[in-house]
Amino acid sequence: MATRNPFDIDHKSKYLREAALEANLSHPETTPTMLTCPIDSGFLKDPVITPEGFVYNKSSILKWLETKKEDPQSRKPLTAKDLQPFPELLIIVNRFVETQTNYEKLKNRLVQNARVAARQKEYTEIPDIFLCPISKTLIKTPVITAQGKVYDQEALSNFLIATGNKDETGKKLSIDDVVVFDELYQQIKVYNFYRKREVQKNQIQPSVSNGFGFFSLNFLTSWLWGTEEKKEKTSSDMTY
């Protein structure tokens, strides 16, 4: 039977503190390294900890040890008996996964609303979903916070510099706390396309109407003139 490493508890406590800190600071679109297995790259589901404080999914490390009798990271000798269950870590993992799930739901709703706004019938006013809450203008490069708030990247960056990393409500926020919202960017491109086309349509329509009226009048005059010429020619060619 393997002797329990006296530092196991200390390793666990340290790992839990650092994992919780990383999870709290991580954007939901990222994956905290301390909550994932270094072997399979997936979230820790059945975590075990080694005497040196490295954490793995039990199934992955056991499979590794079938062919290699060493720790994947330290390269020091390691056996299955050296592994200690680490269920306490699952509280942090599950909490982050839940945060990720809620964030994705919120983000999907934003994208759905943006799709509708991008294809509206009238383009007289910019939809609120495409307006930056700071600059009050159309967003060029959208970025999103962990809470689902959207800004224009340049406007937010300048604002945070001026306020010492505080958002418009006074809460702490840095440019590192946001990620580019590409799905919204694509809908803004669609909106700009339709808005530009609508503007061009409104500008061209009067000219086309005037041009068509002029063309119709000329065509009618020419047709009538040609008809009269044909009548006269026919009359002159007739013999009595």
Curated annotation (Swiss-Prot):
Biological process per Gene Ontology, one example term: proteasome-mediated ubiquitin-dependent protein catabolic process
Highest taxon listed in the record's lineage: Bacteria
Descriptive protein name: E3 ubiquitin-protein ligase LubX
Organism of derivation: Legionella pneumophila (strain Paris)
Its EC number(s): 2.3.2.27
UniProt free text on domains: U-box 1 is critical to the ubiquitin ligase activity, and U-box 2 mediates interaction with host target.
Catalysed reaction, written as an equation: S-ubiquitinyl-[E2 ubiquitin-conjugating enzyme]-L-cysteine + [acceptor protein]-L-lysine = [E2 ubiquitin-conjugating enzyme]-L-cysteine + N(6)-ubiquitinyl-[acceptor protein]-L-lysine
Ubl conjugation recorded as keyword: yes
Molecular function as annotated in GO: protein-folding chaperone binding; ubiquitin protein ligase activity; ubiquitin-protein transferase activity
Domain U-box stretches: 30-103, 125-198
Post-translational modification: Ubiquitinated in the presence of host E1 ubiquitin-activating enzyme, E2 ubiquitin-conjugating enzyme and ubiquitin.
PROSITE patterns (alphabetical): U_BOX
